[in-house]
From Swiss-Prot:
Substrate binds at residues 11-13. GO terms for molecular function: beta-phosphoglucomutase activity; magnesium ion binding; phosphatase activity; sugar-phosphatase activity. SUPFAM superfamilies: HAD-like (SSF56784). Belongs to the HAD-like hydrolase superfamily. CbbY/CbbZ/Gph/YieH family. Keywords: Hydrolase, Magnesium, Metal-binding. It comes from Escherichia coli (strain K12). This is Fructose-1-phosphate phosphatase YqaB. Its cofactor is Mg(2+); Mn(2+); Co(2+); Zn(2+). The lineage of its organism: Bacteria, Pseudomonadati, Pseudomonadota, Gammaproteobacteria, Enterobacterales. NCBIfam families: HAD-SF-IA-v3 (TIGR01509), PGMB-YQAB-SF (TIGR02009), PRK10725.1 (NF008000).
Length: 188
């Protein structure tokens, strides 16, 4: 089905790994310390964004005087301990396994590299990917194309010869901005 592509790129959270419930739990825990609230629909709309950008939206919603990068670090620490105990692969991992060795593959994620690498290794999936590009590897995050362009570069594949598997509107916009085809996994 994906034979015409020279490289396959996968978002991580919500696409190949079921991490979203744990991310929400970590946000609830961290925000509870500050008495802050968040809007679940607004959070879903920000799927694929780096943690600091989500923190900024929460701070603005609550009109709080906090540093979004510091709040993001707290959430990252909270989620790191939770995820290794709770994360499960999603069915799209079967696509990853079936294309292993047939095409170069990469992960392009809005998560921090330490978390992405730890999760993929923990689940025995890291060896399937030629590259992992995370939020701390690029200056401009999804919906900018930088994450996926760096994936293509690290795989040694032209961007127009890549397909991206995504579960978030920001990610699909980023793929298109990179000149890549996108598969919206929410429709599979």
């Amino acid at each position: 089905m994906y034979e015409r592509y020279a490289g396959l790129i996968f978002d991580m959270d919500g696409t190949i790994l079921d991490t979203e419930p744990t991310h929400r739990k970590a946000w609830r825990e961290v925000l509870g310390h500050y008495g802050l609230q968040y809007d679940i629909q607004a959070m879903i709309a920000l799927n694929g964004s780096p943690t600091w950008r989500i923190a900024q939206a929460i701070i603005e919603l609550n009109q709080a005087d906090l540093d979004p990068h510091a709040l993001a670090r707290e959430k990252t620490e909270a989620v790191r301990s939770m995820l290794l105990d709770s994360v499960e692969p999603l069915p799209l991992v079967d696509v990853v396994k079936s294309w292993h060795g047939r095409r170069p593959m990469a992960v392009g994620t809005g998560s921090e590299s330490a978390i992405a690498e730890a999760l993929l290794a923990h689940l025995g999936l890291r060896h399937y990917f030629d590259a992992v590009v995370a939020a701390d590897h690029v200056k401009h995050h999804k919906p900018a194309p930088d994450t996926f362009l760096l994936c293509a570069q690290r795989m040694g594949v032209q961007p127009t010869q890549c397909v991206v598997f995504e579960d978030a509107d920001f990610g699909i916009q980023a793929a298109r901005a990179a000149g890549m085809d996108a598969v919206d996994v929410r429709l599979l």
